[in-house]
């Protein structure tokens, strides 16, 4: 009779063999340059090009600041009250390295990259985690959803919800009309492009009253999209609105980054 330890070792060996075969047939690849990697991460060449956002940065929009002073600092835009949201947290400064990874996640149907970005987003979320009552994605119109295959921000929102046990409402915000892609427009056009494009799902008007909501998005560029969403949420009784994104562009073009590759 085969002993239990022998069976256990056999299963362990079979698992290792199966895993090795998978790595040969489907090797792990860097999400940016597609080089083969040893684990689910960026390759060494891409890793050194990533620009993580660290303090000091604006307390509201997360813009990196050229200052040695600590504390809750505000950038020029936030001193003027540009945004409707209360705080934005982004993991990376947007550059070519992170752009390639987000592009594959967003447009190349590589939905599995949601799990890859998740570990970075969870760490960034820590400072506000206890204050968040609900998580929602940026909605996309059904035409774009059909073309893209999925809403990448919904994948992220659900994964974060699962890991944190914070509730997620996928359809709290609705995209009621198809709009031109924001990336093709200048700043002022972006604002007008989104005017009246979003609405609150009437089924959730009471449950969200007074709640603090976190919107999950992939990239913060001018802030037009999340700003419009935050305005609608607050207009309908939401408490505070937080934003969590994978990356953000720099509004201060004079800010010196370690590299710009």
Give residue spans per PLM region.
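Glycine-rich phosphate/pyrophosphate-handling loop used in enzymes and phosphotransfer proteins
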Residues: 1-217, 221-261
């Amino acid at each position: 009779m085969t002993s239990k330890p022998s069976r256990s070792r056999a299963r362990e060996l079979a698992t290792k063999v199966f895993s090795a075969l998978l790595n040969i047939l489907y090797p792990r690849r860097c999400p940016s340059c597609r080089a083969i990697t040893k684990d689910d991460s960026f390759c060494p060449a891409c890793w050194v090009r990533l620009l993580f956002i660290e303090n000091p940065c604006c307390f509201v929009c997360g813009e990196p600041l050229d200052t040695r002073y600590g504390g809750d600092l505000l950038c020029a835009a936030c001193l003027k009250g540009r945004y409707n949201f209360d705080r934005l947290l982004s993991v990376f400064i947007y550059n070519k390295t992170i752009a390639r990874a987000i592009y594959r996640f967003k447009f190349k149907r590589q939905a599995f990259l949601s799990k890859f970005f998740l570990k970075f987003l969870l760490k960034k979320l820590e400072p506000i985690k206890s204050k968040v009552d609900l998580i929602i994605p940026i909605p996309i119109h059904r035409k774009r959803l059909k073309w893209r295959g999925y809403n990448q921000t919904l994948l992220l929102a659900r994964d974060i919800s699962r890991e944190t046990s914070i509730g997620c409402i996928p359809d709290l915000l609705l995209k009621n009309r198809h709009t031109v892609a924001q990336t093709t427009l200048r700043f002022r056009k972006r604002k007008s492009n989104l005017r009246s494009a979003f609405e609150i799902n009437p089924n959730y008007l009471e449950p969200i009253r007074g709640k603090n909501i976190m919107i999950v998005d992939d990239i913060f560029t001018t802030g037009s999209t999340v700003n419009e969403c935050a305005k609608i949420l607050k207009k309908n009784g939401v408490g505070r609105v937080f934003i969590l994104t994978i990356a953000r562009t720099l509004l201060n073009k004079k800010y010196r980054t370690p590299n710009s590759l």
